[in-house]
Amino acid sequence: MLEVIQTVDETILLWIQETVRQGWLNPLVEFYTTLGNGGLLWIVLSLALLCWRPTRRVGAASLLALAIGFLCTNVAVKPLIQRPRPYTAVEGLIPLLTSGDPNSFPSGHTCAAFAAGLAWGGTCSARGARV
């Protein structure tokens, strides 16, 4: 099963590299990607939510969710699965950015975004805080 997933990934990533990747778009993609590094964007937004009383609970829930997500993803699951990053496993794939973390799955970027979004959605009531 993992071989099938790897083959599909390789095909899609090489197609994107050859068909979609444009030199003028690379800086935008790199910037967008770095926003998610270390959950920085979500941490900054969560800290900002702590500054206003109506959104304080949302900010605290978000920071807690980010911490739990980090522990589950980066400390527990990634070391167990140890799926290599595509640019180390796919021959001919040229990365725009590289990472110090050799494991690609599960995605820390996705975990952080999901954790923050889930916390925001779960703590904002219809009459209460709005984000």
Model-predicted regions and their roles:
Residues 45-73:
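Interfacial segments of alpha-helical transmembrane regions
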Residues 24, 54-59, 125-131:
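Membrane-helix interface segments
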Residues 40, 56, 60-61, 104-106:
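Short alpha-helix boundary/capping motifs
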Residues 49, 73, 77-82, 121, ...:
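Membrane-water interface at transmembrane helix exits
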Residues 1-40, 74-101:
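N-terminal transmembrane-helix/juxtamembrane module of multi-pass inner/ER membrane proteins
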Residues 45, 93-131:
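Membrane-embedded catalytic cores of phosphoryl/pyrophosphoryl-handling enzymes
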Residues 52-54, 68-69, 83-89, 115-116:
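Short alpha-helical linear motifs
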Residues 35-38, 63, 128-131:
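Alpha-helical transmembrane segments
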